[in-house]
């Protein structure tokens, strides 16, 4: 793939090959077990990230916005003899200084799917305490154990407060 850094921007473009061998571990949204099969995908992607944070860890001001676009095919042109399906992923977060000890950290994530037939492996899913625990596009959802399939379009928000105790020691509360 191709990567280019221009000041606070990072641009990426490329293609990837993915192969999935499904067993009987996947379930549809109606609760029925999906039939075992295998799929291969030839995917194209573009990504643009703007990062103005002052620090990599515990930033005090700035923002990070990432926009990604994907087109999924099975032969490089079509998917299942039809038009390919796609997705757009947006992740935006910022650090706002309220005073010398308190910081407000809002965040917004979304994943939008487009197309006629989207296989179960690329459906939106959520669960666990961290992003990308089982699948790269899995969104964290503290109250959900394991992984659950979601609707085609998902938008989530998070608001966190950070308190600097002393020096490099912080407490963060998020919800």
Stretches with model-predicted labels:
Residues 34-36, 41-44:
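Aspartyl protease catalytic domain
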Residues 44-49, 53-166, 171:
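C-terminal outer-membrane beta-barrel translocator/porin domains of Gram-negative envelope proteins
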Residues 1-3, 168, 173:
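Gram-negative (and chloroplast) outer-membrane scaffold detector with strong preference
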């Amino acid at each position: 793939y191709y990567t280019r850094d221009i000041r606070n921007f990072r641009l990426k473009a490329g293609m990837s090959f993915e192969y999935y061998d499904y067993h009987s571990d996947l379930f549809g949204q109606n609760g029925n077990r999906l039939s075992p099969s295998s799929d291969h995908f030839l995917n194209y992607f573009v990504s643009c990230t703007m990062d103005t944070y002052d620090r990599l860890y515990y930033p005090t001001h700035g923002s990070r916005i990432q926009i990604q676009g994907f087109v999924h095919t099975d032969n490089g042109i079509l998917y299942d003899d039809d038009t390919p399906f796609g997705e757009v992923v947006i992740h935006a977060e910022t650090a706002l200084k309220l005073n010398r000890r308190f910081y407000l950290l809002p965040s917004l994530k979304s994943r939008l799917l487009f197309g006629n037939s989207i296989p179960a492996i690329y459906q939106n899913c959520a669960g666990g305490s961290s992003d990308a625990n089982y699948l790269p596009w899995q969104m964290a959802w503290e109250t959900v154990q394991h992984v659950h399939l979601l609707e085609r379009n998902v938008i989530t928000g998070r608001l966190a407060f950070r308190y600097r105790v002393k020096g490099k020691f912080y407490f963060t509360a998020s919800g």
